[in-house]
Amino acid sequence: AFINQHIDLFGKEFYSDIYKKPGIRLTNPKPTNESIFSFKSSIENCKRCNLGMTRNKFVFGSGDPKADLLLVGEGPGEKEDLQGEPFVGRAGKLLDRILKAIGYTRKKKVFITNIVKCRPPDNRDPLPSEVKECSPYLDKQIDLIKPKLIVALGRVAGKTLLQKDILLKEMRNETHYFNSIPLRVTYHPAALLRNPSLKNETWKDFQYIRDFLGS
């Protein structure tokens, strides 16, 4: 079934065998709905950096407040800035398809957020000063959600969480840790749209995620 899902997602040219890896089951106390959403209410008018002056909407993140899987992107794009939700464009639709293929949805078992909560102008990379101002918010989200696995989507998210300025290919295929929580790094869905040859490796990453979490 997963082979067929892989073909449906990426086409026959990206077909690869599925390699099972033993999962590691972690148990953490989970927050109530009120804890994560009351935190959202307390910060959604943030003006700690210049991004707060130019945004349309603060994009806190969305999903299951008891998520096993926390996905972290780099920052909101144009559509996200207008709608106030993460990953709502073409890249978001691709991400939804990948999640569905491993038995997840953004409303069940998954929470999606970004390194910065406001759109950088012209979709540029967030500046170090902007990341610094926003990082306490992500830290608090992680503390409240207590995911079993964090997955950084793309180079910016990866190097921010790892605190290492290295190539994405050097971050992949290794389990790192963020505040004792396992952390993996994979390609951002937008990169897959620009370079379809990355889809096969990304699918392997999500197979690992599925097996790690025991889906």
Where do the PLM segments sit?
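A polyanion-binding, active-site-adjacent surface
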Residues: Q5, F10-S215
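Conserved nucleotidyltransferase catalytic core and NTase-mimicking acidic/glycine-rich helix/loop elements
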Residues: F2
